């Protein structure tokens, strides 16, 4: 899913009077960090819901998890769920290939989200490299954590 889930929550929150930036959403997520629920980001219910926020809450409800109430809780559920998805995917790749990987390269728009990159590092136990790619330009940054 990538940042699809986060982008949809941001779109829902934005009104004529207020447009939330990603740093503002990250701040909300940080305030709610520690909220325990995790969703399967690849579940079909997140492909094109009328409300991503409601889809996250309903998934938590139907799987017997704590239901996020605040937008910060919804955001941290998504961040933790994306990081869990990275962890699961890396484990699957390691099992299929018979290799152990020591690092993950995050490319595209998501690499700019250091909160997500920190979550990926925490969940996977791997080094995370954030790489911005535009045409032939590649900038690699190892997280200073």
Predicted segments, located by residue:
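Active-site core segments that coordinate phosphate-bearing ligands/cofactors
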Residues: 1-104, 112-145
């Amino acid at each position: 899913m990538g940042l699809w889930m986060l982008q949809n929550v941001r779109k829902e929150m934005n009104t004529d009077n207020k447009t939330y930036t990603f740093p503002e959403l990250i701040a909300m997520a940080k305030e709610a960090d520690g909220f325990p629920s995790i969703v399967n980001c690849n579940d079909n219910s997140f492909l094109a819901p009328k409300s991503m926020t409601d889809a996250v809450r309903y998934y938590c409800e139907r799987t017997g998890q704590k239901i996020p109430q605040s937008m910060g809780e919804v955001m941290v559920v998504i961040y933790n769920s994306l990081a869990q998805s990275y962890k699961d995917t890396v484990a699957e790749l390691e099992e299929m290939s018979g290799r152990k990987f020591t690092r993950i390269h995050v490319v595209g728009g998501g690499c700019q989200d250091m909160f997500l990159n920190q979550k990926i590092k925490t969940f996977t136990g791997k080094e995370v490299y954030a790489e911005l790619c535009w045409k032939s330009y590649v900038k690699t940054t190892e997280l200073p954590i």
